[in-house]
Amino acid sequence: MAERIYIFGAHSRAQTLAAYLQALCPGVAIEAYLYNNEEENPAKVGEVPVIRLEKGNLHTEYPVYIGTRGIYHGEIAHALTSLGFEKITPVDVELDLRLRNAYLEKHFAERGRDFLKIEKMKAHGISAAIYVAKSIYDAPLKRQYREEPYEKLIQVGAALTDKRLPDCSVTDDTGDNISTKNRQFCELTALYWIWKNAGEDIVGLAHYRRHFILPPDWLERMLVNRVDVILPVPLYVAPSLRENFRKRHNPMDWDYMMAYLKGRDGKEAQEAEDFFRTNLYSPCNMFIMRREVLDELCGWLFPILFAVAGHSGTKDDSYGNRYPGFLSERLISFFFEKNRDRYNMVYSDKNFLD
């Protein structure tokens, strides 16, 4: 008999959680998705109803998994407890990582592939630099983070301000750069700067709030195992990469991107279309890779982004205006999927700093 559960939340995080639980626990059946706010919620997710958290219409003996942003977990847990629920599991960052990794182990195994992670590999010596993007608009961290010796802070959008961040040893407005595009391209102005100006043989990109969780000897392991690329552990989104973007952003930007790809290379465009019907991508425009791989990626990626941005222009709201960065997450994931037989790719978890 199936174990019936509730998931609190009905949007992207909750749907991702549902995919993990259903894949890992085939005996689990989702009774409903719950909510208690005034946001616009779907009536159903797939065939599962989305219902308001109210007294009298729920099975309080069922377990509840909270699939929302962590800042809401305490408030939601209190609301659930007040209605009589006892089996409440907030899906925090640590549990999300465990579920995501277990899901990907199973996903890769079912396709006859190994899910390789950097911390499982052996070691040997090498040097490299991971550039950490930071801007004058970034909110302060609640707790101080000490950068690793291999991390270099790069101030992004430096061409748009006279203010300099004292902890940043590099700015993205020197040499060949696109620093003035930072309001649209976000951390991609750092990526472009790294491509055109950085001198390391192995380079990476992270954010001031998001860093890779790496073993101390990750550089050595990368060399001895001939790893070409380290990407963030993939994230599952529903209903597909394509529809997830089109629902959360302007669908016309997506449509123009696909039309541009088709006009440039019809075969590649079809491969991209097929990939974007799937659900897994490496988020946040983060990576560590060998220089020659970076050169190939950026030479392929930036012409696409420049074409879309040139066509779609700027948006009035700051979040929507960042569409080139959201497109690039999907494009980078597609690039490495279509080249997975050429490059030795492994994955690493990442953190999120409050």
Model-derived features: positions:
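A residue-level structural signature of the nucleotidyltransferase/glycosyltransferase Rossmann-like core
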Residues: 5-9, 65, 210, 285-286
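A short, charged/proline- and glycine-enriched loop
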Residues: 1-4, 61, 122-129
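Glycine-rich adenosine-cofactor-binding loop
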Residues: 2-21
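A short, acidic, amphipathic alpha-helical segment used as a generic capping/interface helix at domain edges
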Residues: 16, 49-56, 328-335
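Short, well-ordered alpha-helical microsegments
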Residues: 14-17, 72-77, 138-139, 191, ...
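Phosphate-bearing ligand-interacting subdomains
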Residues: 38-113
